């Protein structure tokens, strides 16, 4: 059984989105900005709070981890904690404090964080910070942002994540420096893949057109590097399953169906409920003007999902976020009389609508 498996991989883990390379392709400007701010800790100063935003797969996490790894080579005094902030304020606080999740009150946990910070300057990286803010994360941010020795580095797919902070006191004390990540281009994705291919695969097991095709398809998915890596690893899995010694373009084409399902599931999971309802409205109305989508959304939110109506301005912001994630396309169709451009919103032409609708229904 196992003897017949082709030996394509040297190290399959290199294709994981969790892998942090020794060197980064592109993102030099973002590395420079993050390292400049966090580097103040080497001078004995607390770095300013940072907010790193960009669409999924744009390199926020891997870039931040890369800079943190480099920083740790130059200091042993800093207390650095990386967490995925996808829980309640209490759950996130216990992770930062490394405290048990039972038996202590919230303020007791905050005090333990203070004790850790007193050991030296503390950097807290909160990946997916929007998820805790969508619950009760305000109250944790309230305390952390007021600690003189604490630097908060928040990562989010949401461009408007600051709008999720309802406490004006938190907004005043947090005031992060914002660093934005743009989607990767096809050439950038190809460079990323080529770097990892050298470590991941044995020589000569990829046909020449495999990497360019993975990069081109991922560029159509709003430049998502994780999608490109998934395509490459799934294609290799298919080749191994078919007992082939080489990964071909046809394997990549076959892998798109498997990766599509995973991509859609992951894309929907990272949306807030109001974004899911809005996307559902776009999908079921087959597109239309923002006004038409606005009416459809409010009707669905009230009648079907028990949600609250949004202002048209806020709804337009959410549509722009969905466009950034590659889930919808906004088409300019002409100019109105004295009212600027007219535009329509349609589902992404690169995503299977039936798979998308099913994923939304399952998540709501």
From Swiss-Prot:
Entry binding sites for ATP: 58-62, 184, 196
Query: Which UniProt keywords are listed?
Result: ATP-binding, DNA replication, Nucleotide-binding, Plasmid
Q: Which SMART domains match?
A: AAA (SM00382), Cdc6_C (SM01074)
Asked if Cytoplasm is a keyword of the record, the answer is no
Signal peptide span per the entry?
none
Q: Which GO terms describe its biological process?
A: DNA replication
One Pfam family per UniProt: Cdc6_C
Family annotation (InterPro entries): AAA+_ATPase, AAA_22, Cdc6_C, Cdc6_lid, ORC1/CDC6, Orc1/Cdc6_arc, P-loop_NTPase, WH-like_DNA-bd_sf
Q: Name one GO molecular function term.
A: ATP binding
Checking CDD domains in the record gives: AAA
Q: Does the keyword Nucleotide-binding apply?
A: yes
- Which NCBIfam families is this protein grouped with? orc1/cdc6 family replication initiation protein
Main function: Involved in regulation of DNA replication.
Record PANTHER family: CELL DIVISION CONTROL PROTEIN 6-RELATED (PTHR10763), ORC1-TYPE DNA REPLICATION PROTEIN (PTHR10763:SF22)
Please report which protein family the annotation says this sequence is part of.
Belongs to the CDC6/cdc18 family.
Specify the protein name. Answer: ORC1-type DNA replication protein
Primary gene name: cdc6
């Amino acid at each position: 059984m196992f003897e017949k498996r082709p030996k394509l991989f040297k190290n399959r883990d290199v294709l994981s989105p969790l892998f942090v390379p020794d060197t980064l392709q592109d993102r030099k400007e973002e590395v420079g900005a993050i390292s400049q701010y966090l580097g103040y800790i080497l001078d004995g100063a607390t770095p300013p709070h940072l907010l790193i935003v960009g669409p999924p797969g744009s390199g926020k996490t891997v870039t931040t981890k890369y800079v943190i790894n480099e920083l740790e080579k130059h200091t042993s005094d800093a207390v650095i904690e990386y967490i995925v902030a996808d829980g309640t304020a209490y759950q996130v606080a216990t992770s930062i404090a490394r405290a048990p999740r039972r038996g202590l009150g919230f303020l007791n946990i905050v005090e333990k964080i203070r004790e850790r910070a007193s050991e030296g300057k503390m950097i807290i990286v909160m990946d997916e910070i929007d998820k805790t803010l969508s619950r009760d994360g305000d109250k944790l941010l309230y305390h952390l942002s007021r600690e003189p020795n604490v630097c908060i580095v928040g990562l989010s797919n949401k461009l408007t994540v600051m709008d999720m902070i309802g406490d004006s006191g938190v907004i005043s004390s947090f005031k992060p420096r914002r660093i934005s990540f743009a989607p990767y281009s096809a050439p950038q994705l190809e460079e990323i893949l080529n770097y990892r291919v050298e470590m991941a695969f044995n020589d000569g097991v990829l046909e020449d057109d495999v990497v360019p095709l993975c990069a081109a398809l991922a560029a159509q998915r709003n430049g998502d590097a994780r999608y490109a890596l998934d395509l490459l690893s799934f294609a290799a899995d298919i080749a191994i399953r078919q007992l082939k010694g080489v990964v071909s373009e046809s394997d990549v084409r076959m892998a798109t169906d498997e990766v599509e399902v995973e991509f859609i599931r992951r894309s929907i999971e990272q949306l807030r409920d109001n974004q899911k309802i809005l996307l559902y409205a776009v999908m079921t109305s087959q597109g239309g003007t923002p006004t038409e989508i606005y009416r459809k959304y409010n009707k669905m939110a009230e009648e079907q999902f028990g949600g609250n109506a949004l202002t048209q301005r806020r709804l337009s912001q959410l549509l722009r976020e969905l466009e950034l994630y590659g889930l919808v396309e906004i088409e300019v169709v002409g100019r109105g009389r004295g009212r600027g451009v007219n535009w329509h919103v349609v589902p992404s032409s690169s995503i299977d609508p039936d798979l998308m609708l099913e994923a939304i229904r399952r998540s709501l």
